[in-house]
Regions:
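Short, charged surface segments at domain edges that flank catalytic/cofactor-binding sites
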Residues: 1-34
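Short, flexible micro-motifs
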Residues: 5, 59-60, 80
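Short Cys/His-centered divalent metal-binding micro-motifs
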Residues: 34, 65-91
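Bulky hydrophobic/aromatic packing residues
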Residues: 26-27, 37, 100-103
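Generic alpha-helical hydrophobic packing signal
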Residues: 21-22, 27-30, 45, 66-72
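Arg/Lys-rich, low-complexity, intrinsically disordered N-terminal tails that contact nucleic acids
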Residues: 1-10, 85-103
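Short Fe-S-cluster ligation motifs
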Residues: 56-71, 95-103
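Histidine-centered nuclease catalytic patch
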Residues: 33-67
Length: 103
């Protein structure tokens, strides 16, 4: 029997991760997490492995696990990414092109 299906251990890990620093911030996009959303919602909270299980990561090692949005986790897939990999670039949302060459 694999460790991946042990939902009680994963839920306990989710509670521990919530208590750590940045427990309310998505590890990949650095945006706030909403724990009240239903499980299938794109912005619901999931546990993601920094080194995916498919690449040898341990799904029950708290150092390898982080809280993320469901959509960020689906986008990541089976890749190893660093913290904030999907964070918007500084000033990207507020800066508007000043000339047509920048469009």
């Amino acid at each position: 029997m694999g460790t991946r299906g042990n939902s009680r251990r994963r839920e306990a890990m989710k509670r521990r991760l919530m208590m750590l620093d940045d427990g309310d911030i998505c590890w990949l996009c650095l945006r706030p997490l909403d724990f009240s959303l239903p499980a299938k919602h794109p912005l619901s909270v999931e546990i993601d492995e920094e080194v995916p299980v498919g690449l040898g990561g341990d799904p029950l090692d708290i150092e390898n696990c982080h809280l993320v949005h469901r959509a960020c986790n689906l986008r990541k897939g089976c890749k190893v990414l660093h913290r904030g990999a999907y964070a918007p670039a500084a000033g990207a949302a507020t800066r508007r092109p000043s000339t047509s060459r920048e469009w």
